[in-house]
């Protein structure tokens, strides 16, 4: 690393990472797994476009810090998905990167050992190995696209991606979304602004050119064709924004922007007033709107784990409770199972009219 009076003045270390193609060679996908992911992306695109009447449910831990917990959750999730598949299309949240308002644990890729060692290469290996195992279980997977380089390492494994409230306004993330190979949801801003998400969706649908890395790890000029499979995610802001009036306002603004109204409701964050126990009430309110004839709501997002609540990420690993979130608080598996079964029951026989 060149370091002198002008270059890298505030850089203290440099580590060259393995390339995306090296990581993929170590943890490859089979042709059958590739076909499975392509199929699930197609199903999600059909739901967004109104061709598939089912409700898309992106559900799972706020973040992944323990692969064993993730696998246990996945086994339960997979069994439930099969039982509710005629009305709900369940996609498991597998979030490895966490945006922070100030500082804090940034996720499994950045700091897999949760000790400040920032062993990113180990984090990438752990993440890809886990994702391949989850795909092998037959699950479609969801994540938040945060670091612009991560999709080259892991993007082939995901069926859906989100651009978060803190990054939706970022040009870098809009450009990245335009090149992602899966459908993308754009969250409204942390202040509740819908325009932020709508403008991001419009921008990401267009072709872009930007500097990134290729599969060989080389810096390259990348050209995208634009991503037509976008939608808005209502996550609340200074106040919740999932009421019928809020949904109607989002529909109006999307139509004015020349977009087909297509939106998901995040049952956590601002919509739950940051009280994880309110997520079922939010979900039930949204389902009631669908039963009343709403056709623009295509999905729900739920933060769920094996056990409810959360715990500090700064305590020793040996003292952490199994199956409890180290970031946002989540509802328990028992509550998740009951909620999704109830939604399935409520929507069964009511979805045919939603087909565009």
UniProtKB/Swiss-Prot annotation:
Pathway named in the protein's UniProt entry: Metabolic intermediate biosynthesis; chorismate biosynthesis; chorismate from D-erythrose 4-phosphate and phosphoenolpyruvate: step 1/7
GO biological process: amino acid biosynthetic process; aromatic amino acid family biosynthetic process; chorismate biosynthetic process
Family annotation (SUPFAM superfamilies): Aldolase
Catalysis performed (reactions): D-erythrose 4-phosphate + phosphoenolpyruvate + H2O = 7-phospho-2-dehydro-3-deoxy-D-arabino-heptonate + phosphate
Disulfide bonds: none
Swiss-Prot/TrEMBL keywords: Amino-acid biosynthesis, Aromatic amino acid biosynthesis, Transferase
Gene Ontology CC terms: cytoplasm
Family: Belongs to the class-I DAHP synthase family.
Summary of the function given for this chain in its UniProt record: Stereospecific condensation of phosphoenolpyruvate (PEP) and D-erythrose-4-phosphate (E4P) giving rise to 3-deoxy-D-arabino-heptulosonate-7-phosphate (DAHP).
NCBIfam families: aroFGH, PRK12755.1
Protein name: Phospho-2-dehydro-3-deoxyheptonate aldolase, Tyr-sensitive
